[in-house]
Regions:
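C-terminal output helix
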Residues: 82-91
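Helix N-cap/capping motif at the beta->alpha junctions
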Residues: 8-17, 38
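Receiver (REC) domain active-site loop signature in two-component systems and cognate sites
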Residues: 33
Length: 97
């Protein structure tokens, strides 16, 4: 069983602040958040030089939503609800754990 250190952000602006302060290895970015949505937060993290994997999380599983996530700079996409085995598989995809 793997253990991970998790930082939470309640909105897109806070996600950017956490990225700058904590320098995580991966971001699971909810698309619908108050203050600033996850797509805009992803764009700004990429503009700041963030190259880490950013995985879009959304309740909308439409192709157009997936395309918007990739255009914003997300590396991958998961539709909610997120199941633990699928999340582990996603982490392993990027870190080979």
């Amino acid at each position: 069983r793997k253990e991970y250190e998790v930082y939470r952000a309640h909105d897109g602006q806070e996600a950017i602040e956490k990225f700058e302060g904590c320098r995580p290895d991966m971001i699971l970015m909810d698309i619908k958040m108050p203050v600033m949505d996850g797509l805009e937060a992803t764009r700004r993290i990429r503009l700041k030089g963030g190259t880490l994997p950013i995985i879009a999380l959304t309740a909308n599983a439409y192709d157009s939503d997936r395309d918007k996530a990739f255009e914003a700079g997300c590396d991958d996409y998961m539709a909610k609800p997120i199941m633990a085995p699928a999340l582990r598989e996603m982490i392993e995809k990027y870190f080979g754990e």
